[in-house]
Structures are given as C-alpha cells and as structure tokens.
C-alpha cells in the first residue's frame, strides 16, 4: 500500500503536481517519514539509534532541489536499503561466527527472512573516520587500484549530494570457481554526528545493460557503518553488512567461503591503502 501511494504521489500524479512544488515536497517527505517509522524498531545500538533519529534522506535531498520521477525512485531505493540494512544490524540475535582473525577481525552471518544469508564484518581500523569516508565515498572509483577483488567501479549517475548509481566489475574468485560478476547499484551516503552510513542495493539502469561474458549479480540491502572507536577517536569501528546474490549455480559452501573471505581481504587491503596514503602525506 505504501509503495503504491509513493507511485501515485511521485509518479502517476507527477504531471499534475509539477506546478505544485510545495505539495510535491510535502507528499514525498511524508512518505520518507512513514518509511522510517515502519522500518525502524525501538531497540538498537547507540550509533544506529543516532543515525535513525537524524536520518531522513528523502527530506534532506528534496529540500535542495526537485528531481525527476526516475531520480525520486532511485532516492527512495537508497533510503529503503539503508533503513533495511540498519534494521538487520540492530537485531543482535542469531549471528553465527564464520571467521575470526588474531587481530580481532571477525565475520558473522545469519539468515534473514525475505533477504537470505547476510554477512557482517566487524573490525577496528587504526585511522580516523574521515580518512575511511574519503577513501570509500569520495574516491570510490579508485577502489580497483588497491582492492584486487574489484576490477573497476564507475559512477554512472549522481543524484543530489548523497545518491549515486554505480557499476562495479568484480574479479573472479575462489580459484576461478566463481567467475567475474558485475553489479549495478544505487548507493547513498549519510553523515550524522559521529556516524557515517554507506548503503546500497541492486537497481536497474537502462544505460548499463548486462555485459557479454559477465554474470550480472545483485547486491542488497548492504551497508558500511563507520564511527569513532569509543575512547579512541583516532581509530574507527568499521561494520560491513554484505548481502549478495551471485546468480548462477554455485554450492552454498563456496558462496559462504567466498563472501566471508572477501570481507576479510577487504579489511586488509583497506588498511594497507590507508597506511600507504598516510605515509605519502607525511613525506610531502
């Protein structure tokens, strides 16, 4: 019912509302608030509560400018993905340990109704949060330079200050048992107080059809959460919720191994990248 209402307000009635900017703003803002209210629970870790209390992606973006019907749809997809991912992270029950390293890095997993199996990476990075945010958001397209699991990331479209459509080409994995995949996703990034959330989910983008020789996989809902480590603001607590449908026929054991290992490797590659950039800045 809610999605039908959104379509009516932001889609089917677009021509009628295009000369009624104030009403159009109010309609979409109300829908954003209702999405938040229905998705969020009452009990969650402090950093999630902080983001939830102050997060209204639709509201903040629509106050800045008006968007096309398709752009509004992308914004809504990003908002729903963020709230769904935060809802999954806020539920502390049912997580099982998949992998743990001596330095404390760990990957947990659980099965979520209507989503499937999700993986949760928990690490502490010895770098300030702003450095991670800059690397993961501002320099997103450079990820292929330091993460061998990613061949390329391109921003296909930017919508406002928080939302982008991306195409990601992933390298083969598990000794080529898992061939190359690509993903088309809508991503949104929110900074609220001392917490940053980077969320995403698979979407359709007409200008990026499926590529020959590459399986189009789907992400989502997924998110990365960054916030200063309590008592050590120069360090960052990094949480990555990963939900992926790799498509194709693959044994579950292979999928579980690939995804948990991918998260562990990502943490190591990210640390090396940040250490390298810090050293370069120190020499300048």
Curated annotation (Swiss-Prot):
Keyword flag Cytoplasm: no
Q: Does the keyword Nucleotide-binding apply?
A: no
Residue limits of the START domain? 66-279
CDD domains in the record:
START_STARD1-like
The record's annotation in Pfam families points to:
START
Q: Which residues carry this modification: Phosphoserine?
A: 56, 194
Cellular localisation = Mitochondrion
Q: Which GO terms describe its molecular function?
A: cholesterol binding; cholesterol transfer activity
Can you name a GO cellular component term?
mitochondrion
First and last residues of the transit peptide = 1-62
What pathway is this protein a component of? Steroid metabolism; cholesterol metabolism
- Which regions form coiled coils? none
- Key words of the record: Lipid transport, Lipid-binding, Mitochondrion, Phosphoprotein, Steroidogenesis, Transit peptide, Transport
Subunit architecture: May interact with TSPO.
Write out the function statement from the record. Plays a key role in steroid hormone synthesis by enhancing the metabolism of cholesterol into pregnenolone. Mediates the transfer of cholesterol from the outer mitochondrial membrane to the inner mitochondrial membrane where it is cleaved to pregnenolone.
**The protein's name:** Steroidogenic acute regulatory protein, mitochondrial
